[in-house]
């Protein structure tokens, strides 16, 4: 059995964490070793970087600083969690990965795709997710869900135009490589989204055991 790297992507309020946990439970029913993690974060050091990235500050943060912090946390996460788990044959379910960088720092902040790609290759080498689930929903729906959770983090405080750009970046990436991406309608009820995940389960299990 080989390791499998699955990432879950989408804007604020898309339900990635909830559905990551649901998918993990379904995979564990089949006896699979599943590792749950997230970005930014996933290790003690990377979680400290996450706090820097998400905490609002009077000083502000340059877009390039944000980008470099994201990849610094990712390098630690890969070395300490993701690569070792894949090497032992586990299924890694990660709440956000490099697609989020292309969406938020590329789409939202307007940084060049080429610059992100250079850092991606430097930090990850040839490692890319085997499957990416993109949870898509209208921006206003996602922001309303995020606001209902309580205090907004630094990204959640951005305006609608920022998140429209994030959404479009996700959709462009999903449409550009349909063999890797599965696009799910996250505006549906949770039960409907999870039925869509169940429909993907046989293919995921086949890849795990292939």
Swiss-Prot record:
Enzyme Commission designation: 2.7.4.9
The superkingdom of the source organism is: Bacteria
Task: Give the EC class as a word.
Answer: transferase
Q: Which InterPro entries is this protein grouped with?
A: P-loop_NTPase (IPR027417), Thymidylate_kin-like_dom (IPR039430), Thymidylate_kinase (IPR018094)
Which biological process annotations from GO are given for this protein?
A: dTDP biosynthetic process; dTTP biosynthetic process; dUDP biosynthetic process
Alphabetically ordered keywords of this record: ATP-binding, Kinase, Nucleotide biosynthesis, Nucleotide-binding, Transferase
User: Gene3D superfamilies from the entry?
Assistant: P-loop containing nucleotide triphosphate hydrolases
Q: Name one GO cellular component term.
A: cytosol
Q: Name one Pfam family in it.
A: Thymidylate_kin
Question: Would I find Kinase among this entry's keywords?
Answer: yes
Catalysed reaction(s)? dTMP + ATP = dTDP + ADP
Residues engaged in binding ATP: 10-17
GO terms (molecular function) for this protein are: ATP binding; dTMP kinase activity
Job of this protein = Phosphorylation of dTMP to form dTDP in both de novo and salvage pathways of dTTP synthesis.
Q: Which family does it belong to?
A: Belongs to the thymidylate kinase family.
Question: What name goes with this protein?
Answer: Thymidylate kinase
Q: What is the lineage of its organism?
A: Bacteria, Pseudomonadati, Pseudomonadota, Gammaproteobacteria, Pseudomonadales
């Amino acid at each position: 059995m080989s390791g499998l790297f699955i990432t879950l992507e989408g804007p604020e309020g898309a339900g990635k964490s909830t559905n990551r946990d649901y998918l993990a439970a379904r995979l564990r029913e089949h006896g699979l070793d599943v590792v749950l993690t997230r970005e930014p974060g996933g290790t003690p050091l990377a979680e400290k970087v996450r706090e820097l990235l998400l905490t609002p500050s009077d000083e502000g943060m340059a877009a390039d600083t944000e980008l470099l912090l994201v990849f610094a946390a990712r390098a630690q996460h890969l070395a300490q969690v993701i690569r070792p788990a894949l090497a032992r044959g586990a299924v890694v379910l990660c709440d956000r990965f490099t697609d989020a960088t292309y969406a938020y720092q590329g789409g939202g902040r307007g940084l060049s795709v080429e610059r992100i790609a250079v850092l991606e290759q430097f930090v990850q080498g040839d490692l890319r997710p085997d499957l990416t689930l993109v949870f898509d929903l209208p921006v206003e729906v996602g922001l309303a869900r995020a606001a209902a959770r309580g205090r907004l983090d630094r990204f959640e405080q951005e305006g609608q135009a920022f998140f429209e750009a994030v959404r479009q970046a996700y959709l462009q990436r999903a449409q550009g490589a349909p063999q890797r991406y599965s696009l799910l309608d996250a505006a549906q009820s949770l039960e409907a989204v999870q039925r869509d995940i169940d429909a993907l389960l046989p293919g995921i299990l086949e890849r795990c055991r292939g």
